């Protein structure tokens, strides 16, 4: 198994903010949040506050191409999963691990239908 050096997270709700500070502390600029539109603007302007600490994570948009992430964490609500699957396209390479932290196993099936298992 290859070392995980670059991580992309999509979804900064309850699950996402649990992982984000911890991973960011370890990886710095190699950890980034995938967001666009108003959400991206808000995160760049205000950051995200977790337990009274404000964090400013690097933000990338879905259209950014380049080196794929070693790990993509999907932490969106179930109703946003289809869009998230499309949005992570440029972050996924042949060796990328995709981790879904949504409840249930249906999300894994939907992701595998697009990216393989």
Residue ranges of model-derived segments:
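NAD(P)+-binding Rossmann beta1-loop-alpha1 motif at the extreme N-terminus of oxidoreductases
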Residues: 1-56
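Rossmann-like NAD(P)(H) cofactor-binding subdomain of soluble oxidoreductases
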Residues: 53-55, 60-117
